[in-house]
C-alpha cells in the first residue's frame, strides 16, 4: 500500500507554491471545467472560437490567452461540419488546432488516447471534449458515484499535465434560482470540476444569452453575450464585486451623498428619512439596511453606523470618518457628541 504523502503547515505557510494558471486570463483555469448549456444554444460555436484563440494566442473578448496546441474532440460532428464552421469564423487557422470526431469511451481507453496525443504535442494547453455523454458508458452504479468517477478520471488527467480540459455538457429544463443546479446529472459532476460554466438564454429565439461562471480559483462572474454572424460577442462582463454592488439599495447611495458635508448625524430612522427627503422607504427597512451594509458598503464609504435604544426611543448615529478624501488620514471614528449605548442585534 502506498504511503500517504503529507505536507506540514509550516512548509505550506512559507514555501512558495505555483498558483493555478489560466488558459484564458481570469476565465478558464488549468484543470477540469464543465461547460453546460441547452441543446442547440451555440455551445460548439463558442468552443471553436475559444480553440482558435488559444491556438493562435489571440485574446478572447479582450482577455489574454496562453498560446499552445489545442485538441477539440467534436464527437457529435463531422469534419465537413467543422470545416463549414471554420469558413464562417476565420480566414486563417493555426496548425496548432487539432480535431477528432471519434474517440474511445472513458471506460475503454480515452485517457490512454489523450496521453498518446500529448506525447506528440507536449505543448498542448487546451483539450475540449464535446460532449461528455459521448465518452461515457451506461452504468448500473449509483448515479452520484458514476458521475464523480467519470469526471474524476478527466480531472486527474488534466491535473497531471497542468492543462485545461473543458467538458461540454447539457442542462436540464427546469426552473431554479441557482443556474448551476440545472446542470444535468448529480452534484458529482459540478463537485469534481474546478470551474463550471452555464450558458443560458431567457428565450429560445433570443440572440443574447448569459454565461455564468463559478469555480475554485475562478471568482463568480456573469457575461452577457450576443450571437451574431456565428460568433458569441461580449456585451457586458460583471464581476462578483460589481454584482454585489447592484444589490445595494439605492437609498444607501443617497445616504452617502447626504453625509458628504456632515461629520455626524443623530436621530431616529423617521427623522433620517425626513432629512434625506425620502418617501418610498419605511423606517424599519432603512434601519435593517444600515445594519446589513454597515461593515461593507457604509464602511467602504467611510461612514460609521451605531444603533441604540434610549428612554425616548431608538436612535441612529452616523459619523463620517476622517480621511474621507482618500488621503490615507486617520480613520478613527469622529466623536459622536450625544452618548449612545450600542446594543447587540
Please provide the spans of the model-predicted regions:
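Phosphate-binding/switch region of NTP-binding enzymes
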Residues: 34-36, 40, 44-45, 73, ...
Amino acid at each position: 500500500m502506498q504511503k500517504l504523502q503529507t505536507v506540514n503547515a509550516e512548509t505550506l505557510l512559507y514555501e512558495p507554491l505555483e498558483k493555478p494558471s489560466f488558459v484564458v486570463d481570469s476565465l478558464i483555469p488549468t484543470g477540469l471545467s464543465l461547460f453546460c448549456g441547452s441543446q442547440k444554444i451555440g455551445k460548439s460555436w463558442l468552443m471553436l472560437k475559444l480553440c482558435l484563440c488559444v491556438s493562435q494566442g489571440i485574446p478572447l473578448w479582450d482577455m489574454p490567452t496562453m498560446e499552445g496546441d489545442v485538441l477539440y474532440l467534436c464527437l457529435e460532428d463531422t469534419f465537413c461540419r467543422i470545416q463549414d464552421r471554420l469558413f464562417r469564423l476565420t480566414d486563417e487557422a493555426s496548425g496548432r488546432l487539432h480535431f477528432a470526431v471519434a474517440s474511445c469511451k472513458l471506460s475503454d481507453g480515452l485517457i490512454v488516447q489523450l496521453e498518446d496525443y500529448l506525447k506528440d504535442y507536449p505543448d498542448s494547453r487546451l483539450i475540449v471534449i464535446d460532449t461528455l455523454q459521448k465518452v461515457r458508458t451506461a452504468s448500473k452504479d449509483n448515479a452520484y458515484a458514476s458521475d464523480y468517477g467519470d469526471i474524476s478520471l478527466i480531472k486527474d488527467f488534466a491535473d497531471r499535465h497542468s492543462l485545461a480540459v473543458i467538458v461540454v455538457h447539457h442542462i436540464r429544463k427546469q426552473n431554479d434560482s441557482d443556474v448551476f443546479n440545472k446542470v444535468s446529472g448529480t452534484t458529482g459532476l459540478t463537485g469534481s470540476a474546478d470551474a463550471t460554466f452555464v450558458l443560458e438564454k431567457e428565450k429560445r429565439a433570443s440572440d443574447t444569452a448569459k454565461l455564468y461562471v463559478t469555480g475554485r480559483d475562478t471568482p463568480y462572474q456573469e457575461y452577457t453575450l450576443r450571437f451574431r454572424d456565428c460568433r458569441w460577442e461580449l456585451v457586458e462582463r460583471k464581476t462578483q464585486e460589481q454584482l454585489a454592488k447592484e444589490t445595494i439599495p439605492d437609498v444607501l447611495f443617497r445616504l452617502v451623498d447626504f453625509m458628504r458635508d456632515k461629520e455626524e448625524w443623530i436621530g431616529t430612522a423617521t427623522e433620517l428619512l425626513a432629512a434625506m427627503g425620502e418617501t418610498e422607504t419605511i423606517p424599519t427597512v432603512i434601519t435593517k439596511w444600515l445594519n446589513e451594509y454597515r461593515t461593507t458598503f457604509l464602511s467602504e464609504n467611510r461612514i460609521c453606523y451605531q444603533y441604540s435604544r434610549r428612554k425616548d426611543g431608538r436612535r441612529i448615529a452616523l459619523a463620517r470618518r476622517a480621511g474621507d478624501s482618500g488621503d490615507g488620514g486617520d480613520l478613527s471614528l469622529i466623536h459622536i457628541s450625544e452618548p449612545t449605548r450600542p446594543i447587540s442585534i
